[in-house]
Amino acid sequence: MSEDDQDRILDQSLKVIQAQSYHIHTTIEKNNLRQCLKETFTMLNELRTNKLTPKNYYHLYTSVFDEMQHISNFFKEEIKRGRRIRDLYDSVQQSMYIIPRMYLLITSGSIYIENYPKSCREVIFDLLAVVKGVQNPIRGLFTRYYLLKSIKDKLPDKNNIYDNEGGNFDDTLKFIIQNLDEMNRLWIRLSMGVIGEEKKLREKDRNELKILIGENITRLASLEGLSNEIYQREVLPKILNIIIESKDQLSQQYLMECIIHAFPDEFNISCLDSILNCTKKLVSSVDIKNLFIGLLEKLSKFVKNSDAAKEQILNNSNTIFSILKESFDNLIKENCKEGNNMDIVKVIESQCSFMKFIIISCVSDNKLELVNYVLNLSDEVIKSYGEKIDTSVIKALNRLLSTPLESELSLFDLNQFPKLMNNLDFNSKNNLSLRIIESFVNGKSNEKLDSVDKIKKLLNFIKPLLEDLPDSTQDDFQFEYDQYNVAKLIFVINTNNPEILYNIYTEFKNVFINGGAKRKKITLPSLINAIINLCYSISIAYDEKNNNYPQEKKNEFFNDRINSIDISKINSNDNFYDTMIKFYKLINDIIQSLNQEQPIISFKLYLQAALQVNSINSNKEKFEEACVSFINSAFGIYADNKYEGDYKYSLLNLLSGYLLYFNNLSKENIENFIKNIQSSAHSLVKRSDQCNSMIFVSQLYFSLLKDYKSVIECLEKAKKFADLSMTNPQNLNLFVIILNKMIYYIENSDEMFIQSKFINDINEVIQSHIETLHNENKFIGFLPEIENYYTRTVDMIKIRREIGKKGIYSEITNIDIK
């Protein structure tokens, strides 16, 4: 029958119901019971049709059901007016057709129970017997559904008025389970005896009716008198028996789902072995995978929040997990059969649910064994799958592999994990690798990274982040984000043994240097900084052990430093030296591997390493060679690379700034370094840069060597470079800087090596240039700032002269600004 025909028939029936509804209401208003029954019979006759699909019949039924509520209320009013309930019960049986008679019998029977609770048992089983007369599957299902809905609140239950007087709780269970059984049989009959396309249509019809059958289980689950014990002893075995005996795929699938989702989780936990055993007896076409997913996901959530549930699992763990393993073995075996159309996504999702359940509920020692069992099964499934792995499979596999990362299990004990990861696409591998890193960085993992073996395994797990893969496609931002996360691993190593740390850092180096230039730029500097930081900790701890660490340097980080490392095996200066030199060689090797692609970063890292070596106080003479080697390497990078002028000037000043802190070098080495810087300053492009660098060199001579003659020579050269730079008037500030530097030396030296003539000459040059700029109307925007700087300098000289400090100030002339 076409859809248009269905709509036409349904519309006609609804119009009849609407018309009869009007007549029924009219008779109710007149309190005419006989006529009301007559009109109701006519309305209910519409439910006798066999021409509507289940969906349309349900529409028809709901319209009738709404009207039956008005009729039920009218019957109740009639009883209040004195009509005998028994007469009413007999009157409704006058219809010659069974459907109208059944609906009115059920309605009056419900009222009968309500008024005479003691009759409950007799009436409900009487009604249950008479509805057997409706053998048409669709009409029979809806009649029984109406029966269940009409008396659902009138069944004997804990603490209600029908319990004891009108029966007991066992009667209620018997009634609902028997109704479930009969409805299930009718439901199955809907598709019996047909094949092909007709079978498919009938199965579709049946699927639309399943909620009617499920109402029985919903009602059972809502009974207050239903205890765990009764569920185990009476309810579940009978329902499972109904399911098994039905031998119907749709029935078994749906009713098992109802059991899983309707009854309390604590009940199903107690009966888990029975439920799992039942799955082995279902017909082969039942989707066991979906049942496992629903059951295990639901129970996992429950167990997670219930200690009592965990205890239940613990008490029966061997049985439960043995049955689960057997069930999954059968599931995989069945799905991997040649010729079977494997739903690999559902298979993997069911395994994911199983793994979650294991992780949450298994408190025994075999948790790891079970998780590895699931991973091995997944590997078998992937191998057996003959088709290309698509996005949906990858997503399912990704969820499976992400599950153990949320547990306390050691990632390193999951043998199949890296192998399964290889089946993912690039982005999924990347994301999973990041989750692995986060589990360690954020402290989710209980595993300590305290051995080379673990580091090797970890780096193998996150291999997608460490090398370029054929299908890799990433924007620069995501790439850098990933690599910074990789670098974080270096700082969560959990051992204080220098020897183990050396081996771990060496392993990081061996992997990182093969990652390509873009990765090395991020990962190697982090590794070097970690090693330098470790060297500080070792040297500070050893200095303190030998009472060589300066008291004034013991800041808030001091205790953290000495407590972060175990130097118990470093018991001599030679042993200490050998340990440190080994780390310095490692630092040098790593920087050399970075130097070609990132010379600037390498330059800075060499200086940081040299600064650490210089900080050593114990046996410091032996370490000078290592310090000098690092500084020379930095000089080498500066000399070998041709940078823009401004950048080269910045690097030279950085080098000069670092040199100020190298207080443990010999005088000879310091002189050589200063001369190299001085020579480099002459080769700078800009005169202003040459001037500033020469001023800085004067500071090196002053602070490190107290070589005042060289200080004067540098200042004179700086003045010469400043003179040559005055083609740009803005460089006038260089003279003010030189003047300030000379005053600094006067203030910080007991020896009067600065001559007043030099100061007066500089002072005169400054004033002359300022006057010239004003006379030529070159009052450029920068000039007020320079004048302000110069004025503050002159004011300071005046103050010093007034208080009689340092006789040289009295020899400074011409300091009044014109």
Where are these regions (language model features)?
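Extended, charge-rich low-complexity regions and/or helical-solenoid scaffolds
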Residues: 445-770
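Long amphipathic alpha-helical scaffold regions
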Residues: 1-428, 433-436, 635-638, 644-665, ...
